[in-house]
Amino acid sequence: MSRDSFPHLKNNNSKTALVDGDRDYSFAEVNGLIDRFASGLLRGRADLNEERIAFFIPASADYVTVMHGVWRAGGIAIPLNVASAVAELDHCLTSASVTRMIANGDYQDSLKDLCQRLNIELVSVEDVIQGANQDNVSPLPVIAQERRAMMLFTSGTTNKPKGVVSTHKTIQAQVTTLIDAWCWTQDDVIPLFLPVHHIHGIINILSCSLWSGATVHLFSKFDIPKISVEIIADTYNVFMAVPTIYVKLIQYFDSIDKDQVQKICDGFARMRLNISGSAACPVKLF
């Protein structure tokens, strides 16, 4: 994915792109991290030539750095479910012919034996970025839109998970279509708590936000109390979720007082856009 594909990811853009915990990242900061990570992946090579690079990282600034860094270096990004069992990971890594795995901290520790057995290089985000020192900075390749960009694995409800491949052109078409349909602008602010190994979280929320210059607040899970506080404070003007999330939110209402429930409902009412997607919304819930 070329830099032009995400027009707000520029070195001179000081607007906030990501909020990850207590840290805000500007588009310029994110762009710099992506470039350094991409250069570190290349290690002096001109192009990754669709090398399959998996990552085991929850929604975070590191996740964005890895996804876009792999794209800019010419690889195929393979985000994995951080809740997957070893057997499922083994299947995904083997069937995708993964050569490198990116993971941090405890996630990295849990993958050491598996990656060693499969002869997959296991490195952290920081390791890759540090490898892009001033003496080893690689110019980034020009990526044709028809090249493969991402492989997502299905949920495996009928059989083992299957890898579904998207090209850079496909991703651009999906993102720009959704931006137009939902009238995304750089003034939008949205929370991301959906899984980032599925298309809803990756494309509908994260990619649309970054492409349009909006701000996304990153959560590794649906933290109802914390997100509810932000809804009351009018932090978000866009909210996208699956029906299960709305069910959990309604169940949460039973544990708090009615005044607080009303404040949360009023916060939703003030948003410009609420979406329930990826599955049918039950009539009773609607």
Predicted segments — roles?
Residues 106-146, 253-256:
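ANL superfamily adenylate-forming
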